[in-house]
Amino acid sequence: MGKEKWCYINSGQCSPAFNMALDECLLNWQSEKKMPPTIRFYEWEVPTLTVGYFQRVEKDINMDVVNEKKYGFVRRQTGGRGVLHDKELTYSVIVSEDHPNMPKTVTEAYRVISQGLLDGFKALGLEAYYAVPKTEADRENLKNPRSGVCFDAPSWYEIVVEGRKIAGSAQTRQKGVILQHGSIPLEIDLDELYDLFLFPNERVKERMKSMFASKAVAINELTDRTFTIEQLIKAFEVGFEKGLDVELVPYELTEEQLHEVQTLAKEKYESKEWNYKK
């Protein structure tokens, strides 16, 4: 028996709405048994702030700055907090909940899927490992994030290097399908990032920023080498094949599929109703 074959899609740079619409369509097609499990890598046409499904824009986000910088803005269908996508590789994994290798609990499925990330970081020569909250207090902290910024604390089975979080991921389960997507940052500009969020005052903002710097890290901060997106793609292709014990088979969307994605992008992910709904 050979390895199970999964689809592999490298979308390159796309618009914020297209990126979110394709992830949703892949979830739908998986649910309808039209496609095998899929690994997707993608980038962003412009630096883009994504917010979690439950996040309240007016409470957390400084939209004046987002608009002033001409950044993209879109709401994800996954939970979690705000992420600035810039100078990063973004990934998504779409697989049926009843896949024989997928555990039933969210955290354990997260661990299985994230093994691909772990092996990808190792392929880059980084000593990555899972963060598991050790104490009851640490576990409680996961339920009460300190700010609207995603990377400010490692959660269950988040991947860390030298004690700092290196990949931010979120998961949703709909229609019997798991969608997990997340960021693999080459660089993080803290000033750019924190200008996009609302804080009670400047002092709180600076405190959060310094806490973030002690808890999160990007790949190029960790090594004398400067990696490119192309090198990341190669490393994480290897990582997911090894971590999930599958063979990735390149896949191109059909014209019909592309049209479905573009329609969903326009009708949902470009709409104010969706993006500002909370």
Swiss-Prot record:
Metabolic or biological pathway, per its Swiss-Prot or TrEMBL entry: Protein modification; protein lipoylation via endogenous pathway; protein N(6)-(lipoyl)lysine from octanoyl-[acyl-carrier-protein]
InterPro entries the UniProt entry points to: aa-tRNA-synth_II/BPL/LPL, BPL_LPL_catalytic, LipM, Octanoyltrans_LipM/LipL
Swiss-Prot/TrEMBL catalytic activity: octanoyl-[ACP] + L-lysyl-[protein] = N(6)-octanoyl-L-lysyl-[protein] + holo-[ACP] + H(+)
Site (Lowers pKa of active site Cys): K165
Catalytic residues, chain numbering: C150
Subunit structure: Monomer.
Function: Catalyzes the transfer of endogenously produced octanoic acid from octanoyl-acyl-carrier-protein onto the lipoyl domain of GcvH, an intermediate carrier during protein lipoylation.
Protein name, entry field: Octanoyltransferase LipM
Organism name: Bacillus anthracis
